[in-house]
Amino acid sequence: TSHHEPCMRAGAEYGLFRGPDSKYGDAWSFLTNPEGITEFWRDGLLRNRQFENVITMGMRGENDTAILGADCTLKDNIDLLRQVLKVQNQLIRETVNEDLSKVPRQIVLFTEVEEFFYGNQDTPGLIGDPELDGVTLMLSDNNQGSTRTLPSEKMRNHPGGYGMYYHMDMHGGPHAFEWIGSTYLPKLWEQMTAAYEYGVRDIWVTNVGDIGTQEYGLSFFLDLAYDMEKWGGTDAAITKQYTKEWISKQFRGAFTEEQLEELEKALWEYNRLLARRKHETMNADVYHPVHFGEAQEVLECSEEIIRICGKYKNICPKHKWGAYIS
């Protein structure tokens, strides 16, 4: 389950069962309704234990929000999560396997949860807590495709290892980017190969939103995870080779080699433009109409992409039409 849906239960699921007469209680709060929330988690573990699972640990507030209010201290949050983890581990022992080392578990150190993990000079965080032994620590990017933290050499022996939660699509502030695949492959390569070198190798998750138009970036993310030796390479230029092979894989037999080269160019340049500025943050003042030829270069590049795509639109075979549009 996702980063904010612990013990195999979707957050929205609680809203379907909550109420004054529900055995789960009527508050998504481990402070005021610990018995109801515990029972809710127990039933989720029982329901899913026959399947292959990676159980999400921890807890966030309703609808993927902060678990406690703004008036609560860092210590309040950390103490609550310690208790949550203790209860969840005991539930897993009772319902799944008494040997926790045999149960795949993860906790996603996302947004404010990252602060709860590290703590500060006055308040020890969850780092090193025995309740996290055997739990994969899922680090995250900054919602915009840049990793926030990577494990230090001292941290890399954590039992349970490390994972990465990476955004190719993001709904939220300060600005969202959705619907259009805009992940720049060289940056994706840079961030994920660095994560791999720092020992983040147990779980990779990407928030992809809708798969349509994301196939290119998602394919590279998965292929890189599957075969780091092949696609890790020595520098980001290997993403150019990947693009060539990916275009060939999608359209081989539908277009000539010369035509495939033009389609590769269009996809690469389009991806590069989006790396500079995504659709959601584009406006008339981004590219200067005079200095450094910024606006002119973007216009010429855009016109070339449109020319290539329009040129082959009408000759694309029907069985490849869906792939061509995406």
Predicted regions located by residue number:
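Gly/Pro-rich turn-and-neighbor structural signature
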Residues: L31-P159, K265, R276-Y324
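Catalytic domains of carbohydrate-active enzymes, especially glycoside hydrolases
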Residues: T1, D43, R47-E52, A194-I203
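Short, solvent-exposed turn/loop segments enriched in Gly/Ser/Thr/Pro and often Arg
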Residues: H4-R9, V208-G212
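Generic low-polarity alpha-helical segments
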Residues: T1-H4, M138, W246, I325
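Active-site-adjacent "subsite" loops/lids of carbohydrate-active enzymes
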Residues: E5-R42, P159-Y165
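Short acidic, gly/pro-rich beta-turn/loop elements at beta-sheet edges
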Residues: A10-G19, I67, F117, R148, ...
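Structured mid-domain segments that build the active-site/substrate or prosthetic-cofactor binding neighborhood
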Residues: S140-Q144, P151-K320
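Glycine- and acidic
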Residues: S22-A27, D64-L74, D169-E178
